[in-house]
Amino acid sequence: MHYEQGSYGIKGWGKHGPLTNPYAFGWFEHMRHEGDNKRFPQAFTIYEGGLLGSAYEGRIIAPNALHNLVYVSERLPDGSTFRTKDEEQLITTTDRWFRPVWAGVGPDGGFYMADWYDTRLSHVSPVDDWHKTSGRIYRVRPASGAPKLKPFDLSKASGEELLGYLSHQNEWFRKQAIHEIAWRNMTDLVPKLKAMPLTLETLWALDALNAVEALPINHSDPYIRRWAWKMAGEKQILPPLGEEKHIEVCAQILASAKKLPSAGALFLLRAGDIEDESGHLPLLAWWALEAKAEKERDTVFKYFKADPAFLQTKLFRDHLAEKLAKRYALAGGEENLNSCADLLALTNDETLRGKFIAGIASAFEGAEMPKLPDSLTKALNDYMAKQSGGDLTLALRSGNADALKKALKLLGDAKATNIARIAIAKTLAELGKQEAVMPMVAILKATNPPSLKRGILQAAAKFDDKRIPEALLLGWEGQIAGDKALREDALRVLAGRKEWAQILVSFVNDWKVPVKHFTIDIVRQLSLHKDADIDAAIEKHWRGLLVTGPTPEKKKEAERIKAVIKTGLGDVAKGKIQFMARCAICHKLFDEGGQIGPDLTGYDRANPDFWLDNMFTPSLEIREGFGAYIVKTKGGQILTGLMDAQDANGIVIKDMANNKTAVKQADIEKMEASPISLMPEGLTAGMSDADLKDFFAYLMRK
């Protein structure tokens, strides 16, 4: 991950929570990479030691403790950020205890590693069985011999010696010299520093002595210019923008613009109006503008009026306009909603006004719009009147009665596209329009494509209306059960409400819905209602299915399987078939499979215990970020699944079928982490010894 100042990066929402800014409206993804995808380094350093030669100079050296190796990667420009490309690995070993967890460069130029050296590397398990006496430190040096380094003490070095170290081939000396100059406040070196050719090191030394008089924003070296703009943000100095075109410098200008007061900093947003294939510049520009949108509102609008050409830039039209309108609308309140109207008043350009309108509309997804200022209501109505056929979704959210009639007609129109019918059903459900239930039920009862029914089903689930479970269950064999995905979606929806679940188990008890149609996650969802009739049905039809944790029987079977695979592994191609059938709906391996659970490629796959422990007792150690959540809504639904997204306005829960359900924060009655893994136990059930050998051959493939 490349973190610019003031940026936001992708993270595991379930593990780390939402972004700290609810108006960030985006984040940086991980840097692109070419090479080994088993990425799990615990540490890295960019080597500038001068000892190991050109093959390593400037390279990223990153230990991978989980896979007992050390990567070497080239760092390459990628728009305003970077990408990496793997080269020959520095170290590989078959010793599975080799666990390098720290990396650095020493004063001799050698590459140093701290090796944890242990049988496992996990912070999830609280079991204290670490091997505490075997850690070690390694140094990597040229094969020709150890580097010759005379004893030294930088704390006693003279000023002239420290100045000399600023151009040392080893970055360690360059940085330590700057620290010494700063710690000893060697202001007598300022004239000599100013007389030296300007480098990053001399600039840093001058800055450490508070002796930079003019920021070198026009220097020929773009990295000196970039650092100068960083200093501008930190020192609250506003230099002129000039004609800067170097994309990395532009990124820093935008990062500094976020820190600087808007009176002059808004003009710096133009630094983002250049092509950037990484997509970072538009986000940096947005974060800079958003920081001032409310706190310095008057200055923002004065700038827009004083520089109307900025509103016509690609940056503003494609990346800022919609976000800014959404930000004001989402914040709410009279002043912010008036700012939405003020945005519309800035221009007569219908395309740009459409961007503003789209931003306002997106702020109210999932709910009707509040009472808006008259000026904004008029602007919205004028916009909708000019649209061909009207903007139906926007009209619905604004409370337009005629729009409701049109929406219901579209929902029931068999000639309309499935996409349009599902989209309008979703909007009607979010708005709680009870009139939509009957046409939804009609779709579920009739012969329609499973894809349409699945989309309608997710919308219908929001309504607490008994017509929905009746339609599903009375037409189970003829309209639902034939398609596996639709069938399981229907069962999850039925299991989500207590009253519906009671009706469902009555059909199971009467053998009208087959027991075999239920997956373990659906049975577990039923159990969350804590209802005597439902619990009795679970005990009758799925006794023992929900038992978790280690048992003597599980341990015995795991040992048996381990003995089987010790005799030799089987056919990788056949093992892949087993994986795709049993695991791929949730897990990715070798770039194939689902994304509900973690990507397995980077784990300790050569270790049979890793696989067997997780297969037989998956709830014993649930990987952070992949734990399930149980959400009870104020509308009576119980949802279970992974946290797919989270912000200040609500969450998105992803179930085992990859269906995503958005729940607004105000609609959540209770949310808690589940102690039970989504992963079912008994994945190896029904496998012959030959199947097991094939299966593990694929799982443990190098």
Report residues per predicted region.
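Beta-propeller domains with acidic blade repeats across secreted/periplasmic ectodomains
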Residues: 1-161, 180, 591, 665-666, ...
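Sec/Tat-exported extracytoplasmic proteins
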Residues: 48, 141, 364, 582, ...
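Short beta-alpha junctions and helix-cap segments that line functional grooves
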Residues: 57, 122-126, 472, 597-599, ...
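Sequence context surrounding c-type heme c attachment/ligation sites in exported
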Residues: 112-114, 546-547, 552, 569-584, ...
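Long, ordered, helix-rich scaffold segments
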Residues: 114, 128, 132-133, 140-578, ...
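Inter-heme linker and motif-flanking segments adjacent to c-type heme-binding CXXCH motifs
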Residues: 121, 221-227, 234-235, 585, ...
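C-type cytochrome heme c attachment motif
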Residues: 135-136, 205, 439, 577-591, ...
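C-terminal capping alpha-helices of c-type cytochrome domains
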Residues: 202, 529-530, 540-552, 560, ...
